[in-house]
């Protein structure tokens, strides 16, 4: 009773002060007038603001705009020389800026980029009121892959001249990235032979049946009536048979090249060294060799989530700034053949050799160690995996023995541990933060070009963070 009486007194007081800016006990007077900031979406602006005022000072879009403006874009403009006003494409500098910003912020699809050009403020500022279609964006990216590789080199060289990147230690690593192809669109060589034979038999049976139908129709209607259209079921089988035959030929050509590199010749039969016969004829792949119908240049590789059609993307990263100074891409799952080419590209870009090279056990090899020693580069490369410790070095491999002794010291172990903190965060940032796990272009050359765009965008974003720090 006492509580109910108190509530009635509070409600009476609230009615008496309604419309005033007061509190009544635990009640808030919800119908009191409140002044809000004005909001008129349909109000036209007499003097519209500059688009640059839509973004805060120091925004990544402004940094990328200034960076692209400082680059030599002659390679990008070259394909348009002589077009005049007959065909007016979008400004290549604007297209480069938009693509770099898109990749730096995790947008890789040309359709999504085109949609962001209409909906995202930063994209509208970069494009300056231009709205290229998704097909235009995709064609521009594909047409200028070589130019983007040159721009990557320019950006690293600018960082070198500015003193951001110095000739010190490089950490090297690779990562398997999905190709623009499904592993379910691949077929083994053994199944190709079986499937090709089956399809040829079905085609022969269908042709026999079609000829019998033609003879019957000629007898019924006369030989002048057209009836030469290819049956749909026969056409489908012929197309599939041709596709399988082409894939089978690619596998055989690939195997023949591998056999030549191993010293075999087409006329050696199956007689090997020491009269030990080869397991197969020259140029004949094993039954489990596979080819993909969608992207024949991609390969089945083992990843952390299983086996898939992939390419192997490689990077060399500067120790002090985590700037990518060299890139590579291959369709070979093994890393050991990629270290020296990466070092060569880094030397060409930076104008000198690094002092140290840090890499995991996938890059080990006596020949590689000897080459690095001859070039005055100190290697800190693991000789074994965590689950498979390193075996004692072969006594004949003197460079490997010296590296093992170096890694056994406290200094060597500390230097090698730095590898994880230098290169692995960069790959993790590309795959986890940006979300780049799958190529959007098919073929090794095009995938390599897109990998250069990704690494260029990562470097530009890294420069932006270093500048803001």
Language model regions located:
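Anion-binding and metal-coordination hotspots
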Residues: 37-38, 99, 107-119, 130-469
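Hydrophobic alpha-helical membrane-insertion signals
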Residues: 23-62
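Basic, short loop/linker segments at the boundary and entry of helix-turn-helix/winged-helix-like folds
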Residues: 57-100, 105
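Intrinsically disordered, low-complexity and often Lys/Arg-enriched segments
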Residues: 1-39, 469
